[in-house]
Amino acid sequence: MHDRTFHIETFGCQMNVNDSDWLARALMERGFSPAPFGEARLTIVNTCSVRDKPEQKVYSLLGRIRQATSKKPDAFVAVGGCVAQQIGSGFFSRFPQVRLVFGTDGLAMAPQALDRLVEEPDLKLSLLDFSEDYPERDAVLGQGAVPASVFVNIMQGCDNFCAYCIVPYTRGRQKSRATGTILDECRALLDRGAREITLLGQNVNSFGQDSHGDGTTFAQLLHKVAALPGLERLRFVTPHPKDIAPEVVEAFGTLPNLCPRLHLPLQAGSDRILKLMGRRYDMARYLRIVDDLRAARPDIVLSSDIIVGFPGETEEDFMETMDALETVGYAASYSFCYSDRPGTRAEMLPDKLSREVKLERLERLQTLQNRLTERCLQDMVGRKVEVLLEGMSRKPGDEGDSWQGRDPYGNLVNVALPQGSDVRGRFLPVVVAQAKKHSLLAEQAGAPW
């Protein structure tokens, strides 16, 4: 009997995390067993190439895998995700232990390929072709109940081709998933215990607006999913500001289970830089969307992505981004220094900034964001919210057990409960007692349900 142990390492976005979760369930249904790093025969690396740093981490990890499995002569590696799509079969020559490379559309066929590789030790395979339609996967939920908070893919790829972004080249052109299939997966998850669903896509607002769509708009999809029995909370990521429709904005005011938090990537606060980036909106348009969202749902919380040091960014441009953070008052922003991505338009732009300038600006921006985040969390003190409890907190309570979960605004909340409480996957009314740097401390204010 061949060794069928596996271990998965994941880099990058929530879509990658969701892909890895599906792959793990699919492998276990085929008789594979999870094992710790360095002990598994098969190590799968699900990669990200949005920035240079995670790509370099992949190469470093492959070196560590080679060392960790040096005493397992039959050990091998599968590399998936965006770096696999980008580098392709080049992995075979650079890293001999790699025997499978699979792209984002090839994921659906990866379990069958790994079955073959376990049985045929001299075989190497690549699954790098983009499919014409959404690459539908086997419905694999695993054994027992599913987590209370789950993710559902609604589309693959992107047609925006922002100047800095490699995603359209590594995940392919946009392909919307069939509405009926999405709803079927949501129902199955709810039947197995899910209570919160997050819809995933590179640009969810353009769902259905491609040759693979069935005429359903994203706003219509939101209403269909929100109406499913048993769904207590609904979220989605990631929208593009240029495509956000009035009907989506209105949904925040009309759908009671649509959570009042939205990740709305700005990328830069300078109109000149936004134009160079190819974002196809300006600050005036973005701020109108923010105003409309707050009119529809006054308590909505916003977060963003910010790129610091885009080619040609002046100090004045950067200060406009800083002003934008203050004006919007983001609860959080995911900020990073610009890095060239191969094949993108921005790679060819002149006036690249030095690493020192980019890092100095990033530090200033993150200092400002930390202050804004602390202010947003402080505003929660004294409020009563319901927390979906995910598990035990790493920080033990002074008395009893300490649990953690998320409130409707996406804040991480820690709460002390009597020892032995069985509340995983349940909602708990709490009153926020204290704001920490990146989380909240709360006290129980009602019975779990």
Swiss-Prot record:
Its cofactor is [4Fe-4S] cluster. One of its GO terms (molecular function) is N6-isopentenyladenosine methylthiotransferase activity. Pfam families: Radical_SAM, UPF0004. It is an enzyme of class 2 (transferase). InterPro entries: Elp3/MiaA/NifB-like_rSAM, Methylthiotransferase, Methylthiotransferase_CS, Methylthiotransferase_N, Methylthiotransferase_N_sf, MiaB_methiolase, rSAM, rSAM_horseshoe. It catalyses: N(6)-dimethylallyladenosine(37) in tRNA + (sulfur carrier)-SH + AH2 + 2 S-adenosyl-L-methionine = 2-methylsulfanyl-N(6)-dimethylallyladenosine(37) in tRNA + (sulfur carrier)-H + 5'-deoxyadenosine + L-methionine + A + S-adenosyl-L-homocysteine + 2 H(+). Residues 144-375 form the Radical SAM core domain. [4Fe-4S] cluster 2 binds at residues 158, 162, 165. SMART domains: Elp3. It is found in: Cytoplasm. Binds 2 [4Fe-4S] clusters. One cluster is coordinated with 3 cysteines and an exchangeable S-adenosyl-L-methionine. Residues 4-119 form the MTTase N-terminal domain. [4Fe-4S] cluster 1 binds at residues 13, 48, 82. CDD domains: Radical_SAM. GO terms for cellular component: cytosol. Its EC number is 2.8.4.3. Residues 378-446 form the TRAM domain. Keywords: 4Fe-4S, Cytoplasm, Iron, Iron-sulfur, Metal-binding, S-adenosyl-L-methionine, Transferase, tRNA processing. Catalyzes the methylthiolation of N6-(dimethylallyl)adenosine (i(6)A), leading to the formation of 2-methylthio-N6-(dimethylallyl)adenosine (ms(2)i(6)A) at position 37 in tRNAs that read codons beginning with uridine. NCBIfam families: miaB-methiolase, MiaB/RimO family radical SAM methylthiotransferase. Belongs to the methylthiotransferase family. MiaB subfamily. Monomer. This is tRNA-2-methylthio-N(6)-dimethylallyladenosine synthase. The gene is miaB.
